[in-house]
Swiss-Prot record:
It comes from Danio rerio (Zebrafish). The active site is at 739 (proton acceptor). Disruption phenotype: Morpholino knockdown of the protein causes growth retardation, as evidenced by small fins, abnormal morphogenesis of the tail, and loss of heartbeat. Pericardial effusion was evident in 5-day-old morphant larvae. It is found in: Cytoplasm; Cell membrane; Apical cell membrane; Basolateral cell membrane. This is Dual serine/threonine and tyrosine protein kinase. ATP binds at residues 620-628, 643. GO terms for cellular component: anchoring junction; apical plasma membrane; basolateral plasma membrane; cytoplasm. The gene is dstyk. It holds the Pfam family Pkinase.
């Protein structure tokens, strides 16, 4: 019997796979459910989102099918070999007992030496009792009397392993199922494939393609492989794209020829092969290579790491893909939250701006109409005077239309005379219309540029934000048409609109007062005389009054129509914004947190598969939500700090998951503590609770400890600059820290600072207005729930007070407060730290500005940073900053 330690370690490898497969299956199931709910319940509310964005918040079908196939695949050990004897020998070694007959007990040799092999396929499964049965692959058990049924046995009877001559075709295809109470079989099934002449390899492998994850073992009993066996290996590689573990089961000879054959087919690495621990080598592209075990004595050293890597590769690839989907959609949710928040803020402002600017435009144009009547009169007189001679010449040379003239110029009828007079009048009116309109248009040109263009752009934005409502499109288009008609004065005058016809009809009525006693001759002089009389009969005052009156009437009408249309548009936006706000709340409170938790689980699964569970060292400190331990090394990094967090409820789980996502999404920055990874410990406190282990960069000490130990002024000012740089980076990524304090600033051995503990860190669009932070460092507006990134500036001001004081002693004003509630009350009333005698005037002014009660009056960190640099250069010397850097 073989060493029982061998199957025990192999069993542990499969046990780990099955345990992690359960976590992966659960995460995938919840992920599919999540995306199904998004698709079913929010298809209508997400209609406002871009179609491309909406399609991204989904589970790609090919990825879902691949992951479903991975989690549903059961691990199998497939045993192939040069002959049945080699297969059986390997199986016995694997299980640690002589279960299959060897040597003379097994009967004749198979293959080329022993003729046609009649040994059938074997399948080993777990059961409480040892039993044998024949069954069709994947179907049902056959009623068949086996030799093993006739009495006790330790080794499977040879006749049960062989296909009998009298058996029908169904029994010939049947496989022998051997049920054993064995620890290895509790975790994995084993299949021993038959020789090629019993069942072609292609057919045998067909059953191995569906729903199994194969660990392929190939038993070698000779010095080299035959051409047929090499062909079979090529078929195996094409059918099952998994690495193969080749195992020599015979003791004699070296393995040079065998190694060369396998390396030439790229079935194993052509280099030295395995590392000292027996783990298989990997190709440069990352694809796992097969391995060669030169004896059964080394099976344990080679097979266990080989199996672990095959199983791990499969699960790591699946967990990575799943986490990629989680992160992509989570980032999209956060982007949509920003877009929805901006929509909720900007749309009411756009509506108000449109209403306000239209009012200003209306008042400006109305003022022109009221103020410039006298100017218009003078303009008309001046225009007539400058155009008079040209008008008379044009009238004199006018060719009448639709009138048949006699050769001597006499008209045919009195009706034609009226037509001639009318055409001369029209000539004068049209020329005067054009000249006056051009001058009037120039007087309001600047209004078109400064008002109408902006109004139209604003209306266009409002229209685009309601694409689902046809009514709103009609309203907005109508609104723009009104603007074009009412305010594009040049278009209205030049197009001969109703305005022109109305007041120029009055002009023609004035001209019609000219009376004719006798029908004159239609000569050039007569045309000039008619034009002269028409021009002289025009009243500039009446014309100006008529123009202004019509202008005012049109303006009033357009203004009222504009206001009505805007109200209708606003009503439509109100309903849309209500739906947007509801969706924004769902994204912040449900969608993003749920997806973040799934992302944390998939990422943690990937990390534990790749790097294992970290070992906890001594305790370094305790916080409100977790304990920090030392961790010597993890994932090739050392030393590390490990923060153990046990979320008490779903809310804390979600907050932790979002924190992890924001932190992992951040680019590396020298002023932020690096987060290396996470592991979910399901066995924490003996399995009574689940802990999340966050593994991060280990630094020397925190700022609180550093100040207690004593730091020079130069070091303290440099720390202040480091903290400002770190906060600025967070803000540039759209994040707020919300808990800047001494304990959350860590120092390295050179006393350079890094910000840690992003537990309250969130994007502005994802904040729910919750009151978080450390009371002493909390800005007054935090208590209202409405705040922005200036709360970090306030907290830095308090931190800077400690840095300038060089001590961890509480400010006197805060030390007097008996409770947290009293402290909050005093801070809201304006209570701030006192000025200490050691403070530099410029430092005091800077911290006072940072903790200003009005958030809008606090300085931007881009102003604070150069201010700190100048303070440091003044107090510590010009070159001190450069030397420190």
């Amino acid at each position: 019997m073989e060493n029982p330690q061998k199957p025990r370690e192999l069993t542990r490898a499969f046990n780990h796979y099955n345990k992690h497969s359960g976590f992966l299956k659960k995460n995938l199931k919840e992920t599919i459910l999540f995306f199904r709910e998004i698709r079913q319940n929010h298809s209508n509310t997400c209609a406002a989102a871009e179609p491309g964005q909406l399609s991204c918040i989904s589970f790609p079908r090919q990825d879902e099918e691949y992951l479903q196939n991975v989690v549903s695949s059961a691990p199998y050990i497939l045993i192939l070999g040069q002959d049945c004897s080699a297969r059986y020998q390997l199986l016995n070694c694997l299980l640690g007992e002589r279960l299959l007959p060897l040597g003379p007990e097994a009967g004749g040799a198979c293959g080329a030496e022993g003729g046609a092999c009649r040994r059938r396929k074997l399948c080993f499964t777990h059961g409480r009792q040892t039993r044998l049965s024949l069954a069709l692959p994947g179907q049902y058990e056959l009623v068949h009397q086996l030799a093993a049924h006739c009495g006790r046995w330790d080794t499977v009877p040879r006749q049960d392993l062989e296909i009998q001559e009298c058996e029908d075709p169904a029994q010939r295809l049947a496989e022998l199922e051997i049920t054993l109470h064995h620890t290895l079989l509790q975790e994995v099934k084993i299949m021993v494939l038959p020789c090629r002449n019993v069942q072609p390899l292609e057919e045998a492998l067909e059953d191995c393609k569906r729903g199994i994850l194969p660990i392929v073992l190939y038993a070698v009993s000779r010095e080299s492989l035959s051409a047929q066996q090499l062909e079979d290996l090529q078929t195996l590689r094409e059918s099952l794209p998994f690495p193969v573990c080749f195992i020599r089961v015979s003791d004699g000879g070296g393995g040079g020829a065998l190694f060369t054959q396998l390396a030439s087919l790229q079935l194993i690495s052509a280099s030295a092969g395995n590392c000292a621990c027996g783990a298989p080598a990997a190709q440069s592209a990352g694809r796992m290579q097969g391995v060669l075990c030169d004896s059964l004595e080394r099976l344990q050293r080679v097979l266990v790491p080989f199996t672990r890597q095959v199983l791990q590769n499969q699960q790591v690839e699946a967990a990575t893909l799943l986490n990629t989907i989680h992160c992509r959609c989570l980032d999209l949710f956060i982007i949509q939250a920003f877009d929805m928040q901006r929509d909720l803020q900007i749309t009411p402002r756009r509506l108000e701006y449109t209403r306000e600017k239209e009012g200003e435009l209306f008042c400006s144009l109305m003022a022109i109409a009221n103020r410039k009547q006298e100017e218009m009169k003078e303009m008309i007189v001046e225009t007539l005077s400058s155009m008079k001679e040209q008008l008379l010449e044009d009238a004199q040379n006018l060719d009448f239309t639709d009138i048949i003239m006699s050769s001597n110029g006499e008209p045919v009828s009195s009706k034609d005379i009226k037509v001639c007079i009318s055409q001369i009048q029209d000539l004068i009116v049209n020329r005067l219309n054009q000249a006056v309109a051009n001058k009037l248009t120039n007087s309001v040109d600047y209004l078109r540029e400064s008002f109408v263009g902006t109004l139209e752009r604003c209306l266009g934005s409002l229209e685009k934000s309601t694409p689902e409502s046809c009514a709103h499109n009609v309203t907005s288009n109508h609104l723009k048409q009104i603007l074009n008609a009412a305010y594009h004065v040049e278009v209205t005058f030049h197009s001969g609109s109703s305005v022109t016809r109305l007041f120029w009809e009055q002009i023609k009525q004035i001209i019609h007062r000219i009376t004719w006693v006798n029908p004159p001759a239609i000569t050039a002089e007569w045309k000039r005389k008619v034009a002269q009389d028409a021009i002289e009969s025009l009243s500039a005052a009446k014309l100006a009054k008529s123009i202004c009156s019509q202008f005012r009437t049109r303006l009033n009408s357009s203004h009222e129509a504009f206001a009505a249309s805007l109200r209708q548009l606003e009503e439509g936006h109100t309903g849309r914004l209500e739906r947007t706000e509801d969706l924004w709340l769902r994204v912040r409170k449900d969608h993003a947190p749920r997806l973040a938790r799934l992302s944390l689980e998939s990422r943690s699964l990937r990390d534990i598969l790749l790097h294992g569970k970290p070992k906890l060292g001594r305790e370094l400190g305790r916080g409100q939500y977790g304990v920090v331990y030392l961790c010597d090394s993890w994932a090739g990094r050392h030393p590390c700090a490990l923060k153990s967090v046990v979320p008490p409820d779903d809310k804390h789980w979600n907050d932790l998951a979002l924190e992890f996502h924001y932190t992992r999404s951040l680019p590396k920055h020298e002023r932020l503590v690096n987060l290396h990874g996470s592991v979910i410990d399901h066995s924490y406190s003996g399995g009574s609770s689940i802990a999340v282990l966050l593994i991060m960069e280990r630094l020397h000490r925190d700022l609180y400890t550093g100040l207690k130990a004593g730091l020079s002024l130069k070091e303290r000012l440099l720390i202040a600059l480091d903290v400002v740089e770190g906060i600025r980076f967070l803000h540039s990524q759209g994040l707020l820290h919300r808990d800047i304090k001494l304990k959350n600033v860590l120092l390295d051995k050179q006393n350079r600072a890094k910000i840690t503990d992003l537990g309250f860190c969130k994007p502005e669009a994802m904040m729910s207005g919750s009151i978080v932070g450390t009371p002493i460092h909390m800005a007054p507006e935090l208590f209202t729930g409405k705040y922005d990134n200036s709360v970090d500036v306030y907290a830095f001001g308090i931190l800077f007070w400690y840095l300038c004081s060089g001590s961890v002693k509480l400010p006197e004003a805060f030390e007097k407060c008996a409770s947290k509630d009293q402290l909050w009350t005093n801070v809201k009333k304006g209570c701030r730290p006192e000025r200490l005698p050691v403070f530099d005037e410029e430092c005091w002014q800077l911290m006072e500005a940072c903790w200003n009660g009005d958030p809008s009056q606090r300085p931007l960190l881009g102003i604070v940073q150069p201010g700190l640099q100048s303070i440091m250069e003044r107090l510590c010397g010009e070159k001190s900053l450069e030397d420190s850097n």
